[in-house]
Amino acid sequence: MKVYNTLTRTKEEFVPLEEGKVKMYVCGPTVYNYIHIGNARPFIIFDTLRRYLEYRGYDVTYVQNFTDVDDKIINRSHEEGISPEEVAAKYIKEYFVDCDGLGIKRATVHPQVTDNIQQIIEFIKELEDKGYAYAVNGDVYFDTNKFEGYGKLSGQKQEDLEAGARIEVNDQKRHPMDFVLWKAKKEGEPGWDSPWGEGRPGWHIECSVMSKRYLGETIDIHAGGQDLTFPHHENEIAQSEARSGKTFSKYWMHNGYININDEKMSKSKGNFFTVRDISKLYDLEIVRFFMLSAHYRNPVNFSDEMLNQAKAGLERLYNTKEKLEFTLSNLVESPLTEKEVELVKELDDFRQKFIDAMDDDVNTADAVSVIFELAKLINSNVDENSSLEFAKKCLDEFNELTGVLNIVNKKKDTVLDKDIEELIQKRTDAKKNKEFQLADDIRQQLLDMGIVLEDTRQGVKWKRI
C-alpha cells in the first residue's frame, strides 16, 4: 500500500511503526456550531482509510479530538447565554448525530482539551525548560527560530513564511512566526491555574499533547484537511519534535478543498452549508458517496447537480443489491454452471482490483468504479435461472466491497404504505381484467408518488426513487 506523504511530497510505501498496528490521529472539530460540509470531507475520508486498514487486518487506534475551549466557543456562549461547557457539550452531541448520518465510526478515543489541561501545562513546561518557549505577561510562546526544521511540512523557509504570512502585530513575540502555547486569562473567559498564571491553552498545543497521551511520541499517520497544513500541523511538528527529539508522525495526509458551485466556500459569499442543512435535502449517505467518488487529494465541486449525480449512482447500486436479494430469495439449491465457474473467477478479480485501487493512495474514486463494474456483471448474469451458490457469491462480494466504504448498507423500507399497497393490488387486478388503461394510469400515479414498478416473472417488484 502506498500513501501520499505531505512531508516528503511523494507517494511512499506504507510501513507502520509496529507490524500489524496503526496509530492514527485526525484533527477534530472546534465544537461551537454544527460542522460544515468542508469539515465533513476529512472526517469521511479518514474514516474510510481507517476502515480499509482494518479490512486489511491492521489493529487501528484512531484518535480524534474535540477542541472544547476556544475563542469561538466563548463567543457562542455569550450569544446563547449559556456556559462554554454547555456550548461544547451541545455541539459534541450534534457532531455525533451528523457522523451517524454520514456513516462515520466513533474514534477509539475522542479526547477533549479540558480533560487534558494538566498534561498541556506539563508539555509547555518541558518546552520552556529546553529553551523552546518563553513567557511574557502570562502568555507563553513557542520560539520558532529555535526549531531548525520549522517550515518543512509546508515546504517553506522561515523567512519566506514571515514574508508571505498575514501576521497579527504582537510586540510580545520575539519573532513574527512565534505562536502561542498558553494564553493569559481575560475577563469573562475560562481559565486554569498554571506556572504562568491563570489562562488556557493555545490551539496548536492541544493536538500535540493529546496525540502523545493516547498514541505515544511517534505515530503512524496524522491527517486532516489541506487548510491545516500551515500553520496548525507545522506548529504541531515544531512543538512535538522540540520536546521529544523524535519524529512526530511518519506520514502526513491531507485532503483537498471543497468548492461550492465552483467558488470557495465562505460565509461572506453566502455559500456556507452545514451538514445539518444538507441533511434536510439529501440523505447523508449521498454526501458520503459523493465524497468517495473523487480522489481525496483533489479539490471537489459541491453542487446540487453533483449531489443528484451521486444520488443516481447510489440508487443504481441499491437497485442492484435489491434485485439480487429478490432473485436470491426465489432460487433453490443448485450447483454452479460452467459459465458461473468462470464468472466466480471474475468476482475474485474485482476484489483484487478494489484492493489495488485502495492501495494506491486510498483511491476511492477507482474503488467505486470497480463496484459499478461488479454491479454490471451482477445485473447481466444473475436471474431466475442462476444457481443459488452463484447468486450468494455475488451478494457476498458486493456486500464486502461496499462494506469497506460503508455504503449501500441501509435497509430499505419493506413495509409499503397502505395506500400504495392498495394501488399495486388494484393495478394487478386491472391487468387481470384486461383494463390496461386503468393499469397504466395507476402505474403513473405510483410514479408520481415516487414508486417505480417492474413486472417480472416472479411478480411485481417496486422501488422508491
Curated annotation (Swiss-Prot):
<feature type="binding site">
    <location>
        <position position="207"/>
    </location>
    <ligand>
        <name>Zn(2+)</name>
    </ligand>
</feature>
<dbReference type="GO" id="GO:0005829">
    <property type="term" value="C:cytosol"/>
</dbReference>
<feature type="binding site">
    <location>
        <position position="236"/>
    </location>
    <ligand>
        <name>Zn(2+)</name>
    </ligand>
</feature>
<feature type="binding site">
    <location>
        <position position="27"/>
    </location>
    <ligand>
        <name>Zn(2+)</name>
    </ligand>
</feature>
<comment type="similarity">
    <text>Belongs to the class-I aminoacyl-tRNA synthetase family.</text>
</comment>
<dbReference type="GO" id="GO:0006423">
    <property type="term" value="P:cysteinyl-tRNA aminoacylation"/>
</dbReference>
<feature type="short sequence motif" description="'KMSKS' region">
    <location>
        <begin position="264"/>
        <end position="268"/>
    </location>
</feature>
<keyword id="KW-0648">Protein biosynthesis</keyword>
<dbReference type="GO" id="GO:0005524">
    <property type="term" value="F:ATP binding"/>
</dbReference>
<dbReference type="InterPro" id="IPR015273">
    <property type="entry name" value="Cys-tRNA-synt_Ia_DALR"/>
</dbReference>
<dbReference type="InterPro" id="IPR024909">
    <property type="entry name" value="Cys-tRNA/MSH_ligase"/>
</dbReference>
<dbReference type="InterPro" id="IPR056411">
    <property type="entry name" value="CysS_C"/>
</dbReference>
<feature type="binding site">
    <location>
        <position position="232"/>
    </location>
    <ligand>
        <name>Zn(2+)</name>
    </ligand>
</feature>
<keyword id="KW-0436">Ligase</keyword>
<dbReference type="Pfam" id="PF23493">
    <property type="entry name" value="CysS_C"/>
</dbReference>
<dbReference type="GO" id="GO:0008270">
    <property type="term" value="F:zinc ion binding"/>
</dbReference>
<feature type="short sequence motif" description="'HIGH' region">
    <location>
        <begin position="29"/>
        <end position="39"/>
    </location>
</feature>
<dbReference type="Pfam" id="PF01406">
    <property type="entry name" value="tRNA-synt_1e"/>
</dbReference>
<dbReference type="InterPro" id="IPR015803">
    <property type="entry name" value="Cys-tRNA-ligase"/>
</dbReference>
<dbReference type="InterPro" id="IPR014729">
    <property type="entry name" value="Rossmann-like_a/b/a_fold"/>
</dbReference>
<dbReference type="GO" id="GO:0004817">
    <property type="term" value="F:cysteine-tRNA ligase activity"/>
</dbReference>
<comment type="subunit">
    <text>Monomer.</text>
</comment>
<protein>
    <recommendedName>
        <fullName>Cysteine--tRNA ligase</fullName>
        <ecNumber>6.1.1.16</ecNumber>
    </recommendedName>
</protein>
<dbReference type="InterPro" id="IPR009080">
    <property type="entry name" value="tRNAsynth_Ia_anticodon-bd"/>
</dbReference>
<dbReference type="Pfam" id="PF09190">
    <property type="entry name" value="DALR_2"/>
</dbReference>
<dbReference type="InterPro" id="IPR032678">
    <property type="entry name" value="tRNA-synt_1_cat_dom"/>
</dbReference>
<keyword id="KW-0547">Nucleotide-binding</keyword>
<keyword id="KW-0862">Zinc</keyword>
<keyword id="KW-0067">ATP-binding</keyword>
<keyword id="KW-0030">Aminoacyl-tRNA synthetase</keyword>
<keyword id="KW-0963">Cytoplasm</keyword>
<feature type="binding site">
    <location>
        <position position="267"/>
    </location>
    <ligand>
        <name>ATP</name>
    </ligand>
</feature>
<keyword id="KW-0479">Metal-binding</keyword>
